[in-house]
Amino acid sequence: MRHQIENGSLTLEADTHGAELCSLRKAGGPGELLWSADPAVWGRHAPLCFPWCGRMRDNYFEEGGRRYEAGSHGVARDMEHMLSASGPDFLTFRLGWNGETLALWPWKFSLETTHRLEGDSVVTVCRVQNEDSRPMPFQLGFHTALRCPFTPGKAATDYLVRFEREESPLRVRCDENGLATGEETPVFPGQSAVPLTPGLFDDDSICMKGLRSSWIQLEEAETGRYLRISCEGYPYTLLWSKPGIPGFLCIEPWHGLPGRADLGHAFSE
């Protein structure tokens, strides 16, 4: 079920399914700022990645001598969350452990996600509580898909990705199955802006490590108008779209990486 809030500057909609942001509009702006989740292209808007990011080796992990099937990006994005609190400018969703979660993730937990409007910004805060009697490993990430182009009549190639400062990050390499290989190579050396070209994502996502910038923005080259995402405090940030950039760009701060192709199936690996 969708819920809406507004503050005079922004109007936001979020869904109890996955606690997912699904619409963002600016007053007087050109229209929708998030991807439409067209199922023929990519059927999501801005899913949360919890309790893991990316893929697991062979699509499963092992814990306590038991095998757990594991799809991409965790379980929270595909579960119904409860609207636990709301106000004129915020929505708080809660996902608590139950029989369904324990069948997929063998720890007791709660995940609380708050989306709040602050001026021209959306602030999302996730709080994870371990309610089990043993330590719980987990990862957390965001997979926000920005509409690109966000101005009617423009093309994706009219946009660029801008960093807060000049960067020379390392790219965490993944294999054809989306698993980390352990290899890291330089990417965007000495650059503060990266033009969006049709072939930029022909090799899938670009996972960056070692960024010094506190934000990354999708910027319209001609006008300087932008959509900015904070990545401060996150060890990894990914850029991703489908080949050809068919209407969206994801900027994804992650605490965590996909499984390793050369390691075992324990989650801690």
Role assignments for model-derived ranges:
Residues 84-91, 116-121, 150-154, 220, ...:
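A short, structured loop/turn motif at beta-sheet edges
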Residues 1-63, 67-71, 212-234:
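Beta-strand-rich N-terminal accessory domains
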Residues 18-19, 106-110, 117-123, 133-137, ...:
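Coil-to-beta-strand transition motifs
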Residues 135, 148-232:
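Active-site/ligand-binding surface loops and adjacent short beta/alpha elements
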Residues 225-269:
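Active-site pocket scaffolds in enzymes
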Residues 9-14, 113-115, 122-130:
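Short, well-ordered beta-strand segments enriched in hydrophobic/aromatic residues
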Residues 66-119:
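Extended, loop-rich substrate-binding clefts of extracytoplasmic carbohydrate-active enzymes
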Residues 139-147:
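Histidine-centered catalytic micro-motifs
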